[in-house]
Amino acid sequence: MRSAECGISREGQSRRDAYADIPHSAFPIPHWWGGGAVRLAPEGWPFVVSGWALAALGAWGVAVWGRGMWAVEVALLVVAVWLVVFFRDPVRTGPRGERYVIAPADGRIVDVAVVDEPMYLKAPATRISIFMSVFDVHVNRYPAAGTIELLRYNPGKFLHAAAEKASLDNEQASVGIRTARGPLLVRQIAGLIARRIVTDATPGQRVGQGDRLGIIRFGSRVDVFVPVAGRAAVRVAVGERVRAGVTVLAESLP
């Protein structure tokens, strides 16, 4: 499998090193924005720069042709602002520890179900599905600390990400993590609008809980599979909103 086929980076460490140099904003951010200090995801810069360049071109058009260009300029400004909102990447802190499975994505819980997971866990697992709308933060995070043992891309369809069949049929990237409490699988799933999954992961790599996993561009879903044998209690319900790196999805029982 070639990394270019699915956006899985073979240069994840260099991307993370460059990403660490991007400064945070220095002012408090409202909750709807994502909470905490915020920076832009590196993958978003080409889109944001292009969006604002078009908005600037529209402003020039207004200056040259007058009010007839106002509708176009307003539309371009709306798109430019939305691109900044979409690619925001808030700094997140929350509960940490090997007994917790933390949300890997912002969004709404659309499904909690026990399913068979044959790819990595090869056992019954509780699947917790998070749907991200185009207004949610789309940077994904590791739900637990551990070592990456599996990295697999599967091409597929582009059904609506909230649909039940999306977990099986849509384009997706799966990351299997060996944690202190056993194996855990997290799956990035493309949606109706999303056409690009980026996963900064390498087999054998050690990752921290809440570290950056990647991003899915323009509306998507993330599933977490927790082995039933691990005796983890689910702490969220369908319809609940969660935040990546902050919300506890499941907690291992003593």
Task: Kindly label every feature range from the protein language model.
Residues M1-P30:
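Short, basic, low-complexity termini and linkers enriched in Ser/Thr/Gly/Pro
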Residues W32-P254:
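Contiguous, well-folded functional domains in the mature portion of proteins
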